[in-house]
């Protein structure tokens, strides 16, 4: 193969071939990533199923946490779950329940966050401590070790006496 010969400018034998993939792997860490993040819900007979539609990579792990605060007239109970983003760009959580039963009438504070420990393919997009993340769902805080950024969405889920559910 003469057709496969490298151009003369690249014939420096001191550059190992395996530096090319390493460069390509680290390249995305400097690119800002504008996050799209949309929450949807099926009411599911008082056991709401919450899902997130996002452009974050497959395998991104989200955590959902919900509580019915006593000072809002609630039970003080709640729960949490994690879900991974599917190839279709959706993370779906298990139904939100009160110890397996339909949620009793009360307001519930619901928070959805990305968790700190993410797969390698996700970390390469988010960047170290989430530094690449941009968009209106990005929260940031300096914990004393530098700025950290993550995705966060909070909302109030109101379960009414008639079993209907409203989102505030």
Where on the chain are the PLM-derived regions?
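Short edge beta-strand/loop segments characteristic of extracellular beta-sandwich folds
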Residues: 49-55
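Generic structural signal for short, flexible, solvent-exposed coil/loop and linker residues
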Residues: 24-28, 51, 74
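N-terminal low-complexity, Pro/Thr/Ser-rich intrinsically disordered segments
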Residues: 3-42, 168
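Short coil/turn motif common to extracellular beta-sandwich-like domains
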Residues: 43-49
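Ser/Thr-rich low-complexity repeats and stalk/linker segments
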Residues: 30-37, 44, 55-156, 160-168
């Amino acid at each position: 193969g003469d057709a496969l010969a490298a151009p003369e400018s690249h014939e420096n034998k001191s550059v190992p071939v395996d530096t090319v993939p390493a460069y390509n792997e680290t390249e995305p860490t400097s690119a800002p990533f504008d996050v799209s993040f949309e929450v949807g819900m099926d009411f599911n007979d008082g056991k709401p199923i919450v899902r997130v539609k996002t452009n974050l990579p497959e395998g991104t792990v989200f955590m959902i946490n919900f509580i019915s605060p006593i000072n809002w007239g609630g039970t003080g109970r709640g729960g949490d779950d994690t879900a991974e983003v599917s190839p279709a760009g959706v993370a779906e959580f298990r139904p939100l329940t009160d110890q397996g039963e339909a949620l009793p009438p009360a307001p519930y504070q619901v928070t959805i966050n990305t968790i700190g420990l993410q797969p390698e393919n996700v970390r390469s997009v988010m960047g170290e401590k989430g530094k690449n993340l941009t968009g209106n769902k990005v929260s940031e805080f300096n914990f004393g070790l530098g700025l950290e950024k993550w995705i966060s969405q909070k909302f109030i889920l109101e379960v009414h006496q008639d079993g209907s559910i409203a989102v505030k």
